[in-house]
Amino acid sequence: MAQSNMTRTVGLALEGGGYRGMYTAGVLDVWMEHGLTCDHMVGVSAGAAFGYNFKSRQIGRAIRYNKAYCADKRYAGVASWLRTGDMFNADFAYHEVPIERDPIDLETYRACPMRFTCVCADIETGKAVYHDLPYGDEHDIEWIRASSAIPVATRPVAIEGRKYLDGGVADSIPSAWLFAQGYDRNIVVLTQPAGFVKQPNSVMPMLRRVFRHYPEFVAALEHRHEVYNATLDDLARREAAGEIFVVRPSESVKVPSLCREPDELERIYQIGRRDAEATLPALEAYLAG
C-alpha cells in the first residue's frame, strides 16, 4: 500500500469471511480517502468481492449496496437457494447489482495500474487457483462469484471447463502466495480478531457425502483449519520481525451469513474505518521504513 510517489512495491492480501468483509470495506475506504493504493491486491471470497472497489476507487460502494440489498430476497436467502441452488442469487447479486443498479466504474478500474487477483478452489484438485481480473467485466465477475461460492450454499461455478468453489477452502489467507510475488512491502487485512483459532468444520460428515466424488476437495475441507492456523502462526512471526503489516479487527465482527440488518453491517464497517484510522500512522511508517 503506497502513495503514487513512493518507489517501493507493495502487495496487499485480503481475507474473506462473508459479511465480515464489511470490516475490510471500511479499511479500504479510509485508505482511499488518504490516497493510498498498492501494486498488487489479492483477495479471497468477500475479500475479492469488496476489494473490487479498491481498484475502481469507489469509496463507500461496498457498504452502500450491501446495506441496500441485504434484506432483499432477490439478493440472497433460502428462497434463492431452494430455487437456484445459490444462497446469493447469481443473476441479481453478481450481475444486476454491479452492472445496472450500482455499477462498477469500469473506466477507472481499467485505468488503475493495480494488479488484482482472486483466489478460487478447483473442486477436482482441491488446489487454489489464482486468477487475475484486469477488466472488471462480467467474465471477471464470474471469477469473483466463484471465489465467493460457499460449498453447499452455492453450486460450483463453471468457468472455461473447470468447476470452482470458495477460494477460502484452498487458501483462506493468501499471504504466502503474495510474499512469493516479491514485493518490497506486504500488508494483510484479516477479518478475525487477534487470538482467533479456527476449529475443525463441524459439518464435515455432511460435506464428505456431498463432495464424495471430489476426494481432493474433501481433503482440503478437512485440513482447512490446520492450514489456516499455520498461516496465522506464520503471519505472527513475520509481523514480529517487521516483515509485514497486519490489520485485524480490534473487536468482534461476528455476523450471520445471511445478515438482514443494515445497521449491523454498518457497525462492522465502522469498526474497519476506526481501525484503519488508528493504524494509519504505523502503516505509513512501515511503508516509508
Each language-model region and where it sits:
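Patatin-like phospholipase
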Residues: 1-44, 52-289
